[in-house]
A protein has these predicted regions:
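Alpha/beta enzyme core
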Residues: 2-238
Length: 238
């Protein structure tokens, strides 16, 4: 196994021009698979509520629920660095995610003062901010977050021009989730979306790296046919 990923290792990757690979995962098996694939960051997102638990929005996920998810992912990700979202952005919640959840970094959508408070407590911060504004304004915000102590930036909806400008303006890695691109220091993608796992991909022509949902549907349909026909099911003895 290669060396454990650290904040310092991620920052060195930026200096050397090596792209950082991130995925969002919510359970131990997916974290284990991501680890074996060589992913650098496994992020536990509050997106678990809408994409895995069937909630209407991500706002229904509580901190206590995220703690359980973070613990599960941490058990699976041995090499990759594990980050976890903070629903509130508060220092007390950040401490719980680290102390109880096992997070090695916390991701927060909050202004520089909140980032500074968390970073000052010795907790690495993955600071999220969004595009759709003048490039100069985005560069200034990125610099403020870096100065406040952010270890990484998650720049959503960056666009190539603003994204490239922010990457050049700060020393810390700039990762792109939604609306990112190759102009950033790395990318973040939901593992379920990358492999096409979920009912939303069963009837979709969206491009993915696999169609695991369709494979699962076919496999479970075949299993149901075997049971109803009185045949021995695959993988079970006795």
């Amino acid at each position: 196994m290669t060396a454990k990923i650290t904040i310092a290792a991620l920052q060195e990757m930026k200096r050397e021009g090596r792209k950082i690979v991130g995925v969002v995962a919510w359970d131990t098996p997916m974290a284990q698979i991501a680890d074996r694939a060589g992913v650098d960051i496994v992020s536990v997102g509050d997106s678990v509520g809408k994409n895995l638990w069937g909630h209407a929005t991500e706002n229904e996920v509580t901190l206590d629920e995220l703690l359980i998810v973070c613990q599960a992912v941490r058990r699976g990700a041995v090499r990759a660095l594990v980050s976890c979202d903070i629903p509130s952005g508060s220092l007390s919640d950040a401490k719980r995610l680290v102390d109880e959840g096992g997070a090695q970094m916390v991701k927060v959508l909050a202004p520089a003062p909140a980032v500074r408070a968390i970073a000052a407590a010795g907790i690495p911060v993955f600071a999220e901010f969004h595009g759709g504004r003048p490039t100069a304004e985005l560069v200034d915000e990125a610099k403020r977050l870096e100065e406040a102590g952010a270890a990484l930036l998650d720049f959503r909806h960056s666009g190539p021009d603003a994204g490239a400008a922010v990457v050049k303006a700060v020393r810390i890695p700039v990762i792109g989730g939604l609306g990112g691109g190759p102009w950033l220091d790395g990318r973040m993608r939901m593992a379920h979306a990358a492999i096409g796992y979920g009912t939303q991909w069963l009837d979709s022509q969206a491009e993915t790296y696999a169609h695991v949902g369709s494979i699962a549907l076919g496999a479970l349909s075949a299993y149901a046919e075997d049971v109803r026909a009185g045949r021995q099911i695959k993988g079970q003895r006795g």
